[in-house]
Regions:
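Extended catalytic cores of very large enzyme megasubunits
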Residues: 1-809
Length: 809
């Protein structure tokens, strides 16, 4: 393929014009102790402290890089793409270091993609490979786009540094022969895919079965990826087993997987485990599945309340004994000690087990005066939540059109046994729907997946139905396939009051190629996933920061203009991605599964094109028609036309050459990579807050307005002075001088001196709320007690409001 330069120039560094600076990155515990510190993090000067922290703390390879490297000459490969390894002078057990500069990471990623792209025949010449290498590095450095986290973690460790390790049981398909091959090392073929869908057979210990799935999941979690599985093939509780027993059912096995994921999340090298669990609406155990997290969260509530109640009531028993002023033996006798009798009655009334009451009385006889009973709390990472199950996955119920029609008609719904297909139970569809709604309201799970709608847009139905998704549900395809993601930062393509459509299209083309190359170079956790991912080559290009872009342009997120522009941008990206896929297919051939699915895929592409033209009718094979593009309300006429032409090209090129990829785009949440790109909003969601806290390089935080707000106000016609006033109002003035109500004069009347006022002024700019400034840590305990007349018990009370005490209600 021919690669044009748009951001860089031949003969110049990819980083020309980009200034770099050195920053300090730290992680501190709440008590101030340092967990991680790197004082020499080199990043582009325009990057925020948050973005700098993300790349330093999450994406830098922290150890194992040989201090001395040498290039390995490789026949037929351009010199700038030669691999590196520890130099012969380095020796066994030589000094190793970690990455300290962002350029090392950018070079590692882009170099690896270019290396494998060259070997796979994706570039027409060395000039094109060099252009690709430079353009990709530039986009990474300028935060125009980013690949999913596993790429940052794994890609290029072998190519750039010669890092390797023993095989972890992965497989890949050799791009030269098409032969399935067991990986001989951990990193030569990296694991760049974030999203996996895995199957699970109704088999306990064989390959492809239940226990094998936990091993496959562990391989994914170890390298930072996530996985989803539809478990509906597993028989329900009480169904017959071949050996004559009864099945423990779906939930028993889900709890094993949940516990395994919970253990791996804290022992892995990169991040927490990401896991999706799916159950069909007709599974015999679906009701237990729906209410799983609801019941577990009720257990947490019981643990928290019960532990606090035990701690209070048991110590009340001790208090009743300790305050007795008579004979010691009578102190432990409820007949003689009325206070003890009342305390015992209170404990019994709260259902404190008699064994614990007896234990306290025995302790008292031995001279103990109190008991430490560990109390729990509702923090998501607490011991209480670690005790219950169901906390390590997203849960979804998969519903069909038939189920939704049964809900609408208030009809019966049958739950079907997996062993013989007979009815296990009949209930009202609305009852099941109500359970789903209540559970989602109570604990945010389960979600809903619309089986028939998803499969109506399936490009490869000849190879089976789509039954599941990855953990975040943006990727839906065949079982035992994988998707590697990348996101384009939309706001980075908005300059001087207009969206740079040509730059956006250029970036879309190059990132589509990058994701395709990543399929070729990847290894996978099982033979089945390696084969099917190679055969279908699904990609996950998406965007981030749509909320920030719309705000900067002055369009409401929920406005007709905002929705129209979002739709058009999505259409352009997806159309160009499929056009690029067809161009790649022209050079190296379509994906192996394309032949028998060609008519289906072209039907899906025609439906996309129809929607891109804004058509209400004319769709093929769809029971539910999509919402078409709203060209009339799109504020950018050029983008509107590009949305149509990109799909014209996607269809015409596909009809001639086929497609290299069965899917090309998704809209992912872009959590961590959204932060490394300094996105105001991640994924497709609106901004969650106009005012935020910016992390400072030297530590601490500073209250700021979302950087899109001043730009949006300027676009809407506000003057500079008006914008300053609005920003100050939103952020707060950070001072009590001349403030209404609470100011230096009103505080001086209450006894505040110059020292106390100076302390308030110093604390106010970074305060989340004015109440967080007025406390004894800021003002001093002696001032609060001696001058303001506040008791020590009031100061230690977490619910005490000092401002209200001073009369500022």
């Amino acid at each position: 393929m021919r690669i044009k330069r748009r951001f860089t120039k031949a003969g110049r560094s990819a980083y020309a014009g980009i200034r770099f600076t050195t920053r300090t990155s730290e992680i501190r515990n709440p008590d101030g102790t340092v967990v991680f510190s790197n004082g020499s993090v080199e990043v582009p000067e325009g990057w925020s402290q948050v973005a700098s922290d993300i790349i330093a703390q999450k994406y830098f390879r922290k150890a194992g890089i040989p201090a001395q490297l040498e290039r390995i000459e490789e026949k037929g490969v351009p010199e700038f793409l030669w691999r590196s390894r520890a130099s012969r002078d380095h020796g066994e057990g030589g000094t190793t270091v970690g990455e300290t500069g962002a350029r090392q990471v950018f070079d590692r990623l882009a170099g690896t993609w270019a290396y494998w792209g060259w070997k796979g025949g994706y570039f027409s010449s060395q000039k094109d490979a060099r252009a690709y290498f430079d353009e990709m590095r530039y986009m990474l450095a300028t935060q125009r786009a980013a690949p999913n986290s596993p790429q940052w973690f794994n890609t290029g460790l072998h190519w750039a540094y010669g890092i390797d390790g023993p095989s972890q049981g992965h497989h890949y398909v050799d791009y030269r022969t098409g032969r399935l091959t067991r990986s001989g090392s951990a990193y030569e073929h990296p694991q760049p895919h974030a999203c996996f869908i895995q199957s699970c057979a109704d088999d306990l210990v064989n390959d492809g079965g239940i226990m094998d799935l936990w091993v496959r999941e562990a391989r994914l979690f170890k390298y930072g990826s996530g996985t989803g599985t539809n478990f509906s093939r597993l028989r329900g509780e009480g169904e017959a087993l071949s050996g004559g027993g009864r099945s423990s059912g779906l939930m028993g096995f889900l709890k094993i997987g949940d516990r395994a994921a919970g253990a791996i999340k804290s022992g892995g090298t990169t991040r927490r485990a990401a896991k999706m669990v799916i159950c069909d609406a007709d599974h015999p155990d679906v009701e237990s599945f729906i209410n799983w997290k609801v019941r577990e969260e009720q257990k947490v509530a019981s643990l928290v309340a019960g532990s606090k109640m035990h701690e209070a009531r048991l110590n009340e028993i001790f208090a009743a004994i300790n305050t007795w002023d008579g004979v010691h033996e009578d102190a432990i006798d409820p007949a003689a000690n009325p206070a003890l009798k009342a305390a015992l009655r209170a404990a019994k009334g709260c259902a404190i087990p008699e064994a614990y009451v007896k234990r306290v009385l025995d302790y008292a006889r031995q001279g103990y005066t109190s008991i430490e009973f560990p109390t729990q709390n509702t923090d998501w990472d607490s011991e209480a939540y670690g005790t219950v199950s169901g906390q390590n996955s997203n849960n979804s119920v998969r519903v069909t059109d038939a189920f939704l029609e049964a809900v609408a008609d208030d009809a019966d719904w049958a739950l079907i046994r997996r062993t013989d297909g007979k009815v296990a139970k009949v209930l009202k569809a609305r009852d099941l729907w109500e359970q789903i709604g209540h559970a989602a309201w109570a604990c945010a799970d389960p979600g809903i997946q619309y089986h028939d709608t998803v499969n109506a847009w399936h490009t490869c139905p000849e190879d089976g139905e789509i039954r599941g998704s990855n953990p975040c549900s943006e990727y839906m395809f065949l079982d035992d396939t994988a998707c590697n993601l990348a996101s384009i930062n939309l706001l980075a393509f908005y300059r001087d009051g207009r969206f740079m459509a040509e730059d956006y299209i250029h970036a879309t083309r190059l990132w589509t190629l990058t994701l395709e190359i990543s399929v070729m170079m990847a290894q996978f956790p099982s033979k089945e996933i390696a084969r099917r991912s190679y055969d279908f080559r699904t990609l996950g290009l998406g965007f981030a920061n749509i909320g920030g872009l719309l705000m900067t342009m002055g369009h409401g997120y929920d406005s007709v203009e905002g929705r129209a522009l979002c739709g058009v941008l999505t259409a352009v990206m997806t159309g160009v991605a499929y056009s690029t896929s067809a161009e790649i297919s022209r050079e190296v051939g379509p994906f192996p599964g394309y032949g028998k699915n060609a008519s289906h895929m072209l039907r899906v592409i025609r439906n996309h094109r129809n929607a891109a033209y804004g058509m209400a009718d004319g769709y093929e094979g769809l029971a539910v028609r999509p919402v078409p593009l709203d060209h009339a309300n799109c504020p950018d006429a050029k983008l509107s036309e590009l949305a149509k032409s990109s799909w014209d090209e996607a269809l015409s090129l596909g009809e001639r050459h086929g497609y290299r990829n069965a899917q090309a785009t998704v809209i992912a949440p872009t959590g961590t990579i959204g932060l490394v790109m300094d996105c105001d909003t991640t994924g497709i969601e609106p901004d969650f807050a106009l005012v935020k806290f910016k992390k400072l390089a030297g530590g601490g935080y500073f209250k700021i307005i979302n950087r899109s707000v001043p730009a949006a106000l300027g676009t809407l016609g506000y003057s500079t002075s008006q914008i300053e006033d609005i920003v100050s109002y939103a952020v707060g003035h950070g001072t009590f001088r001349s403030a209404p109500g609470i100011n230096h004069d009103s505080l001086a009347d209450l006894g505040f001196g110059a020292k106390e006022l100076d302390r308030l002024e110093a604390a106010s700019p970074s305060a989340f709320d004015i109440r967080f400034v007025f406390n004894h840590w800021t003002l001093g305990e002696r001032f609060c007690t001696d001058t303001l007349g506040i008791s020590a018990s009031q100061l230690s009370d977490q619910g005490f409001d000092l401002l209200r005490h001073l009369g500022f209600g």
